[in-house]
Amino acid sequence: YQKFLGEIMLLGVNIDHIAVLREARQVNDPDILMGMYAAIIGGADQITTHLREDRRHINENDVKDIINHSRVPVNLECSINEEIIDFVCKFRPHRATLVPEKREELTTEGGLNLSTAGLENVINRLKNEGIKVSLFIDTSRENIDIASELAVDCIELHTGTYANIFNMLNSNI
């Protein structure tokens, strides 16, 4: 699995929650770019954001501004929805992390289903545009092997199960 270790990132900062606050306030405060700049000044060597299909937090203008103004690589998390992938190919972030998306989820609750129809085509399309591809996957040897076969540049492991284990072990379930 050495092939996944090509780039070393020390601090990647997800700035989505800046947009969550902005949308809750229904004004342009806090400003997404000011948050991005603060993260970079603080040492971030990657900025991550998630363009959801429903645009509930981050929107297309945010992504354009982030890509155009960031001096560090931008990782854009997204679904494999065709409209979203068209946008990603047009604005070409450094990396696209493909994630599952269900509108009813508050946050992503699991990894991408690697047998999803069209996934390999999306990966190839992004790579042909010069965009590095990452997959957000559940932690299993099988998923890691499949990701390797798909020749993605890196993977991100969903660790929700591990994060929630204490509550599961100490609940009355």
Specify the residue positions occupied by each region the protein language model found:
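Histidine/lysine/aspartate-rich catalytic loop segments that bind and position anionic ligands
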Residues: 134-173
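Conserved N-terminal beta1-alpha1 strand-loop-helix module at the mouth
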Residues: 4-77, 81-93, 146-149, 167-172
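A structural motif corresponding to the C-terminal end of an alpha-helix
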Residues: 42-45, 121-133
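N-terminal small/glycine-rich loop or linker at the start of catalytic domains
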Residues: 8-24, 102, 106-109, 120, ...
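Non-cysteine beta-strand/loop elements that form the S-adenosyl-L-methionine
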Residues: 10-16, 93-103, 152-160
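Glycine-rich tight-turn/loop motif centered on a GG-T
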Residues: 23-29, 71, 104-118, 160-173
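Short beta-strand segments at enzyme active-site cores
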Residues: 46-51, 97-98, 133-137, 155-158
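Active-site beta->alpha loop and helix N-cap motifs at the rims of alpha/beta catalytic domains
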Residues: 79-114
